[in-house]
């Protein structure tokens, strides 16, 4: 616990309170968090948490690859107007959670085409869901790696 500090509240000198002094988050934890977002699984690899890296990072990679294989569509900022453009933002943020996987696909133009034939596939919506889950799961993996590096979790 933190140090005991005597506080004068209304003339009562006998009352004491425990104040916890929070340590600042180490800079290395921020680096681990950024690396964990950028390359799924790398945050745990940097900390030599091999099992977590394989399971959590592997799940993100697997979901992303399966989502693309099923013909899923990744979201980006659309050129639409009004609420149509705003409705693209939350799924884009979820997809962006996949880090470098999203960036590479964006640079190569893979998964971003608005093709009616792609949307007609029976697995299209499953692919979308897998891509969204990959990004969201990577956010959770990133937070887990950050908490371990910050000393909040074993």
PLM region descriptions:
Residues 2-33, 56-154:
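Transmembrane helix recognition focused on a "late"/terminal membrane span
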